[in-house]
Design a protein with these regions (language model features):
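Conserved GNAT acetyl-CoA-binding A-motif
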Residues: 131-144
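Conserved acetyl-CoA-binding loop-helix of GNAT-fold acetyltransferases
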Residues: 116-129, 154
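Conserved N-terminal entry element of GNAT/NAT acetyltransferase domains
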Residues: 13-38
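Short coil/loop residues immediately preceding or within conserved phosphate-binding loops
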Residues: 82, 139, 169-171
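Residue-identity detector for glycine
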Residues: 5-8, 12
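Conserved active-site alpha-helix within GNAT-family acetyltransferase domains
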Residues: 121, 146-162, 166-170
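Terminal substrate-recognition subdomain of acyl/acetyltransferases
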Residues: 20-22, 133-134, 147, 165, ...
Length: 179
């Protein structure tokens, strides 16, 4: 009789196909070093330009680029007001997530070629696990761009208000509650 399990047989033939149903585990998530912040800034800028900037005013684009500039990120990391994690594949940075104010997610970007591969979820999982260890942190907040609202919903966030615009940046305030 033909073997059973992950291998399948074509009726009447002794031909088998082995299917690997597991997702590759070649992505490493770890805290970013200050020397990696320029690459993180560049990644955020590329992804923002393609997916979010078309919906923003010039004022909003400028505000984002100033916030995500390498020198701004480095200054905030140095003074302890920001922490960032990166997703790496074969040593290449493919995604970033950033935390401010102990529980506010402010940057989550994944290279276009790596979308829908669980990278954002893995980055959020690292950030969430970090926040769970902090005292008096009942939730994680985010100001989601219009493009990312549905992705944040899939991660377990819920909107806490309607869309707003501040300094040209369009966003929906959302939160993730630790239950």
């Amino acid at each position: 009789p033909p073997p059973r399990g992950a291998a399948g047989a074509f009726p009447g033939r002794r031909c088998f196909i082995r299917i690997n149903m597991e997702k590759p585990t070649d992505t490493a998530i770890r805290p970013l070093h200050e020397t990696e912040l320029p690459a993180a800034s560049a990644l955020a800028g590329r992804v923002f330009a393609e997916f979010e900037a078309p919906e923003y005013s010039p004022e909003g684009i400028g505000a984002f680029l100033r916030f995500a500039a390498p020198e701004t990120l480095a200054a905030q990391h140095r003074n302890g007001s920001m922490q960032s994690w990166g997703a790496f594949r074969q040593g290449t940075l493919i995604g970033i997530i950033t935390l401010t104010r102990r529980s506010h997610l402010c940057l989550l970007f994944v290279e276009k070629a790596c979308h829908r591969q669980g990278i954002a979820r893995a980055l959020f999982s690292a950030l969430r696990d970090h926040c769970r260890t902090a005292p008096d942190t009942p939730r994680i907040t985010v100001n989601s761009s219009p493009y990312a609202v549905e992705a944040y919903r899939r991660l377990g966030f819920r909107a806490t208000g309607g869309e707003r615009t501040v300094d040209g940046i369009r966003f929906t305030p959302m939160e993730y509650l630790f239950i």
